[in-house]
Amino acid sequence: MNPSTALATVLVDTLVRLGLRHLVLSPGSRSAPLAYAAARAADEGRLTLHVRVDERSAGFLALGLARAGELVAVVTTSGTAVANLHPAVLEAHHAGVPLVVLSADRPHELRGSGASQTADAQARMFLPSVRYSADVPAPVDPDRQAPAWRSLLSRAVAFARGLRGDGPGPVHLNVGFADPLTPSPGDVPPGPGLTQVHGPGAPAPVALERGPRTLVLAGDAPDPATGAAARELAESAGWPLLAEPSSGARGGERAVGPYRLLLDAVDAEGPLGAVERVVLFGHPTLSRPVTRLLARDDVELVVVSAAGTWSDAGFRAARVVPAAQVQGPPGAGEQEFAARWDRAGKLAADAVDAALDAEAGLSGPWAAREVVAACAADGSTLVVAASNAIRDVDLTARPLGVRTVSNRGLAGIDGTTATAEGVALATGPTRLLLGDLAFLHDANALLPVPGEVRPDLTVVVVNDDGGGIFETLEHASAVDRATFERVVATPHGVDVAALCAAFGVAHSRPATRAEALAALTARPRGLRVVELVTARDRVRPRLERIAAAVRAAVA
């Protein structure tokens, strides 16, 4: 086989042997050797190949597949195609999600020469946001070079999985290919076996002393082990658990549902606010009450992180430990504190439900509660956009243990639908909850590609014609309404039904709660969009009523 075919074949074969199960491809000429090698492996049943036209959507599709625990690679041709992966790479970097990026390039001698579709810095494009980066020269002698290629991939995958370096994350291999780019027959170049890389092993837990009135706080954590550790600590210690929806810990007897309303409602000197210690897992970013809690001078902050980095945006961490456990029986003060939080959590959840049920129309918070309940009932996965939708889930949904994914690494709304498609293709029936701006931002993810499998994904669009989250922030009252609408809220007036029709996607627009419940509770089958039209000017008053109801319930 010719050198480019040999290189591509060795790369794909080695990735499969290292555990690759999904490869996402955006076609191009320079990357054709990788495309042919991937297609051949897919035909042999060794991997699942996903083809997408838009590289940005391809990147987030790969991210969604990777969030389901799979080893995933994404392949693009050279030039701006590679740059379109950058948002997904940044999210994978900040969230700690393993992802293998393979970008095709021209041979080294053509870089900097003005050759078409050649970026001088393509090999360094993602630095410093990748765990490992390598620039692979165009092959000259495949039989001699093949062992080096296999070794390089073993190293790259080890870094992607977090077996070396600062925890899991994306890696980038920029691969040179010279003509001919079309396949030719021949044997795979021989070489030694793969390098088996072992991680450092489970860290020894640090014992936390009994006595302080303690809350366990679980932020976003793509690794299920992080959420499981937070929940296990809270349950074994008997401490209240404040868990964000995408933490993997939001369930069990210690989980408190509308915790952020409780933090906002209570006095720091009162029985609920008298916190002495917070044990933090993951990356908490959803609410200002949590941020204020973590910034309190009178609260000891213990961060649990085995990676080389940890969350401490308030610069208050007293200790960072790789793992934590508690020994001995709780003190009387701990038990009383936990019991108060448990009672307050139940009262607050009932107050939220009553406030939502008192309304007759559709709303984001109501939809969030019902979508989570539907996922809990049929075991489907939930994907939530990183803006208002995830906050509505955090506010109104009961802690039912639903597997929830959200791109909270950098908290962008781009690529949300493609991420959900990846999750659904890897895990099965999935619901996606997002706003209209997040939906429109990733409309290309709906584009049908002949021969590609459509996921079992119900996309629930809460359409308030603009950025509803900004109604809850200071921007809504900082300037005149016309300026706010134009440069902050950005209403669009898009006909979502017409957009779905253009992409050949089923669409419904229920008008009542009964109609909406029927659509939301139907088990996801195929790709369909459920549009819930709501009023943006009611967002802030509704949240104020819910907060007032919680304050009254726990007073």
Curated annotation (Swiss-Prot):
UniProt-recorded Gene Ontology molecular function terms: 2-succinyl-5-enolpyruvyl-6-hydroxy-3-cyclohexene-1-carboxylic-acid synthase activity; magnesium ion binding; manganese ion binding; thiamine pyrophosphate binding
GO BP, one annotated term: menaquinone biosynthetic process
Catalyzed chemical reaction(s): isochorismate + 2-oxoglutarate + H(+) = 5-enolpyruvoyl-6-hydroxy-2-succinyl-cyclohex-3-ene-1-carboxylate + CO2
Cofactor: Mg(2+); Mn(2+); thiamine diphosphate
Sorted UniProt keywords: Magnesium, Manganese, Menaquinone biosynthesis, Metal-binding, Thiamine pyrophosphate, Transferase
SUPFAM superfamilies: Thiamin diphosphate-binding fold (THDP-binding)
CDD domains documented for this protein: TPP_PYR_MenD, TPP_SHCHC_synthase
Pathway participation: Quinol/quinone metabolism; 1,4-dihydroxy-2-naphthoate biosynthesis; 1,4-dihydroxy-2-naphthoate from chorismate: step 2/7; Quinol/quinone metabolism; menaquinone biosynthesis
InterPro entries membership: MenaQ_synth_MenD (IPR004433), THDP-binding (IPR029061), Thiamin_PyroP_enz_TPP-bd_dom (IPR012001)
Class in the EC hierarchy, top level: transferase
Enzyme Commission code(s) on record: 2.2.1.9
Co-factor binding details: Binds 1 thiamine pyrophosphate per subunit.
Pfam families per the UniProt record, alphabetical: TPP_enzyme_N
Entry's family note: Belongs to the TPP enzyme family. MenD subfamily.
Database matches in NCBIfam families: menD
Known role: Catalyzes the thiamine diphosphate-dependent decarboxylation of 2-oxoglutarate and the subsequent addition of the resulting succinic semialdehyde-thiamine pyrophosphate anion to isochorismate to yield 2-succinyl-5-enolpyruvyl-6-hydroxy-3-cyclohexene-1-carboxylate (SEPHCHC).
Subunit note: Homodimer.
Protein name: 2-succinyl-5-enolpyruvyl-6-hydroxy-3-cyclohexene-1-carboxylate synthase
Source lineage: Bacteria, Bacillati, Actinomycetota, Actinomycetes, Kineosporiales
